[in-house]
């Protein structure tokens, strides 16, 4: 039996995003999500997480969108006080100690709402940066949580055997889940990253990935899993 986690990123980004994720959970394949702690829809996401307890919720660590929770992290922000664009972060021009403090603050904020994280991942996959490997090791140990798999040599405490990020843009196809069994060999655990949402003005303002989120939601709520695949949580 193939064990499948369908994780919706960006919980908390906007209220429309939050509602899309909840719809994808109630009426579709979404069984896990990760919450952004520095976004306009964060408080709304917390409320929904407490209401829909069957949805596994982790923390979507942020380093490339919005403002940091801490004020004393100069290597993480541009002159406007916002996080750097992801291109800057991927160049490795961040102080790992500041990243660790900021990500710790994000996790602690999540915990302050009485929520328990199922796992950690990150916005734009920045937790895969080699210079942040030790940071991830410490966070995983401190909070006793698994972390989304990156490339094999950079995986830190992964839960899944495989991670697919290709249900995105042109990869959002009607038969994606039908063909999934052909891609997975044996009894493996697979995580698929998804981004369902309903469009609202805040989403249009904050993300370049908009229209395909609605298509994702439709496919996630209309698709059925092939025999031999079961949904599991972190």
From Swiss-Prot:
Which top-rank group of organisms is this from?
A: Bacteria
Q: What class of enzyme is it?
A: hydrolase
Q: What is its EC number?
A: 3.5.1.-
What is its cofactor? Mg(2+)
Q: Please name one Pfam family that this protein belongs to.
A: YdjC
Q: Show the GO MF annotations.
A: deacetylase activity; hydrolase activity, acting on carbon-nitrogen (but not peptide) bonds, in linear amides; metal ion binding
Positions bound to Mg(2+): 60, 123
Record bears the keyword Magnesium: yes
Query: What keywords are assigned to this protein?
Result: Carbohydrate metabolism, Hydrolase, Magnesium, Metal-binding
Which GO biological process categories is it annotated with? polysaccharide catabolic process
Record has Kinase as a keyword = no
What HAMAP family is this protein classified in?
COD
Q: Which family does it belong to?
A: Belongs to the YdjC deacetylase family.
| Official protein name in the record | Carbohydrate deacetylase
Q: What species does this protein belong to?
A: Bacillus anthracis
């Amino acid at each position: 039996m193939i064990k499948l986690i369908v994780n919706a990123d960006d919980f908390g980004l906007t209220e429309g995003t939050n509602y899309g994720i909840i719809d994808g959970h109630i009426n579709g394949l979404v069984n896990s999500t990760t919450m952004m702690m520095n976004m306009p829809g964060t408080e709304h996401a917390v409320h929904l997480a407490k209401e829909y307890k069957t949805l596994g919720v982790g923390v979507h660590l942020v380093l490339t969108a919005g403002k940091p929770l801490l004020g004393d992290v100069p290597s993480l922000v541009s002159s406007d006080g916002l996080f750097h664009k992801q291109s800057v972060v991927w160049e490795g021009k961040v102080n790992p100690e500041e990243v660790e403090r900021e990500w710790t603050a994000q996790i602690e904020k999540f915990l302050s709402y009485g929520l328990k994280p199922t796992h950690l991942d990150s916005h734009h996959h920045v937790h895969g940066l080699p210079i942040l490997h030790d940071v991830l090791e410490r966070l995983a140990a401190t909070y006793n949580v698994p972390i989304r798999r990156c490339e094999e040599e950079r995986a830190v405490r992964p839960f899944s055997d495989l991670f697919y990020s290709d249900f995105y843009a042109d990869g959002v196809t009607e038969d994606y889940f039908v063909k999934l069994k052909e891609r997975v060999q044996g009894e493996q655990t697979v995580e698929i990253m998804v981004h369902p949402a309903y469009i609202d003005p805040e989403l249009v303002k904050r993300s370049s990935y908009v229209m395909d989120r609605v298509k994702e939601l439709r496919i996630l709520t209309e698709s059925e899993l092939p025999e031999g695949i079961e949904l599991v949580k972190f």
